[in-house]
Amino acid sequence: MVRFRVLACDFDGTIATEGVVAPATLAALERVRRSGRRLLLVTGRTAAQLETVFGRWDVFDRLVLENGALLVDPSAGTEWLLCAPVSSRLKPELRRRGVEPLAVGRAVYAASVRHLEVIRETIRDLGLSLDLVVNRDGVVILPRGVSKLSGVAAALFDIGETAAACVAVGDAENDLPMLAFAGCGVAVANGLDEVKAVADLVTCRPAGEGVAELVNGLLADDLAAELAIAGGMGAALH
């Protein structure tokens, strides 16, 4: 019996490098689908931001966008907001205070991390209760309790799967909840040290090459050999 039936992948810094998914990485993901397993794409990007760099949504069973706020079924062309949107009062005030560029999604906003203190002050001045999630050089502004974990949980429920059956792979701070939630959390070699420190496995190769490496292990023996060797956090894939 297959233990890990779902692979949940972060986008930037994981399957993609500077917004580009290499053909070899895409081929590896297609192998996962052909094996009968399910694929989730999990990203802080809005739909518009993702569309500008990556059009192969059909490879995935579900997309978790906006850091867990929006769930998309690409085959059916349907989407569900998983939370109430951030207050509309915030956008004009952020722009008035010079927070540009400001990406506006269905439920969240995103900006450069250099604006972090201004964003915090603005939220406080408006009396709003929101979460801020830093992702390397960006910050996502989102409703309380929304994360990649909550988004993946919704996606798994929608496809009739469980966290125990899921392998999640990522590289940055906003991936931490998802990796902890999954049955097996994997960090790519280029991931932040804090991510690699808590991952069950760490790939030997970076980004998309590391994902292809992970796929090889997943399809070979359901990661049994890698997890047997691991015996603890952060063991390297072979």
Task: Write out the residue ranges for each language-model feature.
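Hydrophobic "anchor" residues on beta-strands that sit immediately upstream
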Residues: 6-8, 62, 167, 196
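Asp-based phosphoryl-transfer active-site loop
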Residues: 2-19, 179
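Active-site phosphate-binding/coordination module
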Residues: 18-104
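Short, well-ordered beta-strand core segments
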Residues: 7, 32, 63, 185-187, ...
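Hydrophobic/aromatic beta-strand patches that form the interior of the parallel beta-sheet core
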Residues: 40, 64, 167-169, 186, ...
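Asp-based, Mg2+/Mn2+-dependent phosphohydrolase catalytic module
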Residues: 1, 181, 186-238
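Conserved acidic, metal-coordinating active-site core of Asp-based
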Residues: 87-182, 186, 190, 196-198
